[in-house]
C-alpha cells in the first residue's frame, strides 16, 4: 500500500516562519534577533531588500535614551552581517602579462558588477552581500580616539546624513583580507572570519587599539563648511590649489585628531575595484573626465607673430605653441 505524504502549503510555511520570527522578536534576546536577521540578509535577493531588513531590525532594537547609533551600527556590521563566503581575485604580474584584466576566484566567480550611470542603474551582484553592503552616516572623531555617529542612512534624513555640520562617512563590514604573489599572479581575498595570514582593515581600528565591526571611509572629497572649516559632505565648495601640508593644517583647525585622508583610503578603493571588477585599476571601468588637454600641431616659421583663435574652436583650453 502506497504511503501518503502530506506536504505543507507555501502559505502554511510562511505562517510558521512568521510565528517563529515574532517569537524571537518578542523575546528581546539580542543575540537571537541578530541571528534571525543575519539569516534573512543572507537569503535576500537584492540590496533594496537588505535595506528594508536593516530598517526593520533597527526599529526593533532601538530603545530611545538607551541604545546609541554607535552601538547598533556595531551590532549590525559586527554580528548581523556575516557569512562564510570567500571573495577573491587574481591579476597577472607585469612579467606574466601586461594586461590589467584579472579573474574572479572562490565565491566571487559568476558575480557581475557593471557601474551605474546617471542614465541607468546597472547590475551589482555584490551590493547585497554582507561583506559589501554599505551605509552612510554622519560622524565625528573625538579627541580621545573614539568616534560618535550622529545620523544614519535610512533612519535619519539625508540632509542630516550628508549635509550636516558633521563628516559624511560610508561604513562597510570590517572584514579580513590577505594579499600575496604566487605563480606569476597577485592574489587578493576577503572573508568575514579570521584565518591564517588574514588581517582586518586598518581604518577599522582606532588609535586606542579598539577594533570595530565596521570600517569608515569618507563619502566625499573635502570641501569648506559654512563656518569656513574643512569638512566632508554634500554641497561643499571644493578645496583647490592647496598643498598636502596646507590641507593637514586645515584639518588640524577642525581638531587635533584630524589630518585628512590617508593612503588607506586608496588601498581600499583599489581593493574594491579588484574584487568587483577583477581589474588592477579603474581605467576603462569607472572614469570621470578623461581628457583635459587639447593640443593642435602647427608648422610655423615666424617669430613675434600674434595669433587669434577662431569661433570654430571655443577657448576652453590653454593655448600653447610649440616650435618643431
Residue ranges and their predicted role:
Residues 1-48:
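Short, low-complexity N-terminal tether/leader segments at secretion or assembly junctions of large
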Residues 65-67, 73-176, 180-234, 314-315:
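Short acidic-hydrophobic catalytic motif
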Residues 8, 13, 20, 34, ...:
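Short, intrinsically disordered low-complexity segments
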Amino acid at each position: 500500500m502506497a504511503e501518503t505524504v502530506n506536504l505543507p502549503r507555501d502559505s502554511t510555511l510562511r505562517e510558521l516562519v512568521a510565528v517563529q520570527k515574532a517569537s524571537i522578536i518578542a523575546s528581546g534576546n539580542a543575540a537571537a534577533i541578530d541571528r534571525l536577521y543575519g539569516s534573512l540578509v543572507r537569503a535576500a535577493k537584492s540590496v533594496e531588500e537588505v535595506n528594508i531588513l536593516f530598517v526593520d531590525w533597527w526599529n526593533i532594537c532601538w530603545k530611545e535614551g538607551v541604545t546609541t547609533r554607535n552601538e547598533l551600527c556595531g551590532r549590525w556590521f559586527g554580528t548581523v552581517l556575516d557569512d562564510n563566503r570567500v571573495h577573491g581575485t587574481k591579476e597577472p604580474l607585469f612579467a606574466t602579462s601586461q594586461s590589467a584584466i584579472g579573474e574572479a576566484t572562490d565565491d566571487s566567480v559568476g558575480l557581475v558588477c557593471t557601474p551605474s550611470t546617471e542614465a541607468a542603474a546597472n547590475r551589482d551582484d555584490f551590493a547585497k552581500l554582507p561583506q559589501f553592503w554599505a551605509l552612510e552616516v554622519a560622524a565625528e572623531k573625538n579627541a580621545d580616539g573614539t568616534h560618535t555617529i550622529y545620523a544614519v542612512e535610512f533612519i535619519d534624513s539625508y540632509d542630516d546624513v550628508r549635509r550636516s555640520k558633521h563628516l559624511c562617512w560610508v561604513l562597510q563590514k570590517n572584514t579580513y583580507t590577505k594579499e600575496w604573489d604566487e605563480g606569476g599572479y597577485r592574489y587578493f581575498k576577503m572573508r568575514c572570519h579570521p584565518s591564517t595570514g588574514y588581517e582586518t582593515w586598518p581604518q577599522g581600528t582606532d588609535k586606542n587599539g579598539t577594533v570595530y565591526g565596521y570600517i569608515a571611509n569618507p563619502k566625499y572629497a573635502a570641501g569648506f563648511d559654512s563656518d569656513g572649516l574643512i569638512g566632508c559632505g554634500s554641497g561643499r565648495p571644493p578645496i583647490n590649489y592647496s598643498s598636502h601640508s596646507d590641507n593637514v593644517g586645515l584639518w588640524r583647525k577642525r581638531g587635533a585628531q584630524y589630518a585628512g585622508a590617508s593612503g588607506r583610503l586608496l588601498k581600499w578603493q583599489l581593493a574594491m575595484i579588484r574584487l568587483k571588477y577583477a581589474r588592477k585599476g579603474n581605467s576603462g571601468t569607472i572614469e570621470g573626465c578623461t581628457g583635459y588637454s587639447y593640443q593642435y600641431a602647427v608648422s610655423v616659421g615666424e617669430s613675434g607673430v600674434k595669433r587669434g583663435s577662431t569661433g570654430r574652436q571655443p577657448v576652453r583650453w590653454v593655448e600653447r605653441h610649440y616650435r618643431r
